[in-house]
């Protein structure tokens, strides 16, 4: 453990192997069969257990848990492992779990990856290099992910699925099948279905004006002519309805995004 910077509150079991310039922050827990290669940094409250190896220059943020047993009923305490490569960034609350007898006894992560807050990598997954998993991406067991893949936040991937190289999965996508290399996958996005009439009534908005505003947005989003013309026409037609005027003002503001598509 020479040349390592270890906080006095860290708990490092006898047998753990630390490379040069390893930094271990407050309240980290390192098991006896853990190997941390050169320049690994654990910020604080990081737990690394099991037969686990972390490659050089990897940085792990608070409350991440690496190398714990897989979440499967048939796990029989087999001596499976977790291998993580070099130059990875593993953010807060990420979990990477060990392999199992049914999956080759190893969970493996490559190099130069970014796992954002709350990512879960299940048992026996094989993750390539240069991938980005956004917040709360969840991978079940036995999943293969190719190099340069990007998975959007809150997406979940079914066990045994294969995600090909250079593919991109949009946020909030449930993926239950293989994704081809270079594929672009996304789930149905949120749509505008009307107005929040119940909430508006609870807040004391006039019921007649609320129903009139509902008709107005139907004319804006599904009427004849182009969008700008429809906005202008509706603004003139409902100029005495404060709810409609508030919606029109919002529509006329500059935005970096499109509007939710209207589906009646």
From Swiss-Prot:
Q: Where in the cell is it found?
A: Cytoplasm
Instruction: Quote the EC number.
Output: 2.3.1.129
- Pathway as given in its UniProt record: Glycolipid biosynthesis; lipid IV(A) biosynthesis; lipid IV(A) from (3R)-3-hydroxytetradecanoyl-[acyl-carrier-protein] and UDP-N-acetyl-alpha-D-glucosamine: step 1/6
Keyword annotations for this protein, in alphabetical order, are: Acyltransferase, Cytoplasm, Lipid A biosynthesis, Lipid biosynthesis, Lipid metabolism, Repeat, Transferase
Q: What class of enzyme is it?
A: transferase
Q: Which CDD domains match?
A: LbH_UDP-GlcNAc_AT
Extract the SUPFAM superfamilies matched here: Trimeric LpxA-like enzymes
Tell me which positions the record assigns to the signal sequence. none
Q: Which GO terms describe its cellular component?
A: cytoplasm; membrane
Disulphide bridges: none
Keyword Nucleotide-binding appears in the UniProt entry:
no
Self-association and partners: Homotrimer.
Q: What family does the entry list?
A: Belongs to the transferase hexapeptide repeat family. LpxA subfamily.
Name of the protein this chain belongs to: Acyl-[acyl-carrier-protein]--UDP-N-acetylglucosamine O-acyltransferase
Q: What is the lineage of its organism?
A: Bacteria, Pseudomonadati, Pseudomonadota, Alphaproteobacteria, Rickettsiales
